Amino acid sequence: MANMLRSWMMLAALAVCLLVCLSSFADAYPPKPESPGSNASPEDWAKYHAAVRHYVNLITRQRYGKRSTPEQAVAWLLFGADSSQDAEPRLDYSDQW
């Protein structure tokens, strides 16, 4: 009985963790602008169109810059974003395996 209760608790903890992780992805994009309605003033429509333009520019913006090679990606994962680190291992390190 205790083993079954423990498995349910682990399942509930996993579900809560998944919900927390998924909620963090919900904030990845800005909220869509809301339409001002059919009988809005021209100024409200101008603000709405500016907000839509800004929204589209944010979600479709280009990613400029040099694409990294797989070696650079592995070095970034190993050494972090610090560019002062060498991508190659140190020479005094010898792998004994």
Swiss-Prot record:
The modification Tyrosine amide is found at residue 64. Residues 1-28 form the signal peptide. Its main location: secreted. GO terms for biological process: feeding behavior; neuropeptide signaling pathway. It is found in: Secreted. It comes from the Eukaryota. GO terms for molecular function: neuropeptide hormone activity; neuropeptide Y receptor binding. PROSITE patterns: PANCREATIC_HORMONE_1 (PS00265), PANCREATIC_HORMONE_2 (PS50276). InterPro entries: Pancreatic_hormone-like, Pancreatic_hormone-like_CS. Keywords: Amidation, Cleavage on pair of basic residues, Hormone, Neuropeptide, Secreted, Signal. GO terms for cellular component: extracellular space. Pfam families: Hormone_3. CDD domains: PAH. Belongs to the NPY family. This is Peptide Y.
